[in-house]
Amino acid sequence: IFDGNYDEIRDWIIHGQVDCGFLSSIVADDLTFYPLLNDPLCAVFPEGHPLAAKNSVTLPELFEYPLIIETPGCDNDIQHLLTKCPVRPKISYSFRDDTLIMSFVRNGLGVTISQELVLKAFARGVVSRPLSPSCHRTLGLAFSKTANSVVSQTMLRYLQETIH
């Protein structure tokens, strides 16, 4: 088992270092990809923040505040979302670690965009709201287009049965 960011995992699959990997669909275009679940993206800010009174948050509203993001390559879905928005955020900090990002947000040093699955581990001291319009990442199991091990196929079947 290897732990890496999306770009590292993708490269490991392509170069045959691993049979398969968990990826977001956004980085799996040259791989065989089996979607497993959709994970909503949310705006995240400290408790007591002015945006906490809203039911949902637009990117332009969020970008009025200093933004803390994951280092490019760690979360390509959010990077892709940022490139689609006509309003450019003021990125104050960029980190590889979710714990560090949430700590900075919790301490009022900025706001961030995160995935609902990640937020389950960091609920204390932060508030999240859905983005408007809604956005999500599609997570799944990716394989090389040329590799197809029995172990990988067994794992895929197990995940499909367990998650769905």
Spell out what each predicted region is.
Residues S25-I26, E47, P72, Q115-V118, ...:
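Short secondary-structure boundary segments
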Residues I1-D29, R88, S94-F95:
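Central regulatory/effector-binding core of bacterial HTH transcription factors
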